Curated annotation (Swiss-Prot):
Record's protein name: Beta-ketoacyl-[acyl-carrier-protein] synthase III
Keyword terms: Acyltransferase, Cytoplasm, Fatty acid biosynthesis, Fatty acid metabolism, Lipid biosynthesis, Lipid metabolism, Multifunctional enzyme, Transferase
Record's keyword annotation contains Lipid metabolism: yes
Pfam families: ACP_syn_III, ACP_syn_III_C
Residues annotated as the enzyme's active site: 120, 253, 283
Cellular-component GO terms for this entry: cytoplasm
Chief location of this protein within or outside the cell: cytoplasm
Swiss-Prot/TrEMBL domain comment: The last Arg residue of the ACP-binding site is essential for the weak association between ACP/AcpP and FabH.
Amino acid sequence: MTKYAKIIGTGSYLPPRRVTNQDLAAQLAEKGIETSDEWIFSRSGISARHWADPDVASSDLAVKAAEQAIEAAGIDRQSIDLILVATSTPDFVFPSTACIIQNKLGINNQCAAFDLQAVCSGFVYALATADKFIRSGSHRNVLVIGTEVFSRILDFNDRTTCVLFGDGAGAVVLSASDEPGILSTAMHSDGSHVGILCVPGNVHGGAIAGNAFLHMDGQAVFKLAVTVLDKVARETMAAAEIQPEQIDWLIPHQANIRIMQGTARKLGLPAERMIAVVHEHGNTSAASIPLALDAAVRDGRIRPGQTVLMEGVGGGFTWGAALLRM
């Protein structure tokens, strides 16, 4: 049985269209909705976000990120034997976005490919799932992707939510290894909180039934997120017998700088050991953690041998964490 699943390559992609808070304020003003750069930044830490063009799908963003990750890993893409895609904004109702990505990447080895939906916790859930497949010995090289086009489900009459989210994709290649990689993972959910963060629409009779825009009770999400993130981080560290002071980098879900800072503070980690890209990306849901990871790998902050704690929280309510050695 394989001992570890190790990240051997990372990649990311943001659509070219960058929308600043000033741009968004001007757009909303045309609808008679008031907001400002100061209002948005003071509540979220967000200065800008990237939005995909109307003809660009989640799979298109994912392919760009995956190409980078595969190149960084230095493997033949035909050796990938599982593709896991975390997304809440799939290309189609079905088939899975993972199958679409498999085809676009030209991976023709008939490997398994499926989507996983845990909203903003999605990448951590997918990473944990990939870890289990590799540790079982059934798979050796797994492509894990978080990709979202949340701009498609935003209600631009609701200034409390439409200013927060962006589009993007991040990817990693996990490979079977005798060297320490993923040390521990934890996943949790509580369906009694479905209503505080959701898109409650569905397809019926060939049309959207109900409300297909994102709804969020920001205060309820904030209160619950800070509590569960601290608990799951400690659970994951305890499972690996790691103390907070041994963590080199914290990569939280990039939702809101106040939630991110609150979690770091509870863990006793200084702000300079937290990877934060929320100011430039906004909340990219399942893409946020791999986007932040790739940025820090490529700029040299995260180096081989360092210990990284990832944690995410999202609609469901879902939350999870992964502790790994790079």
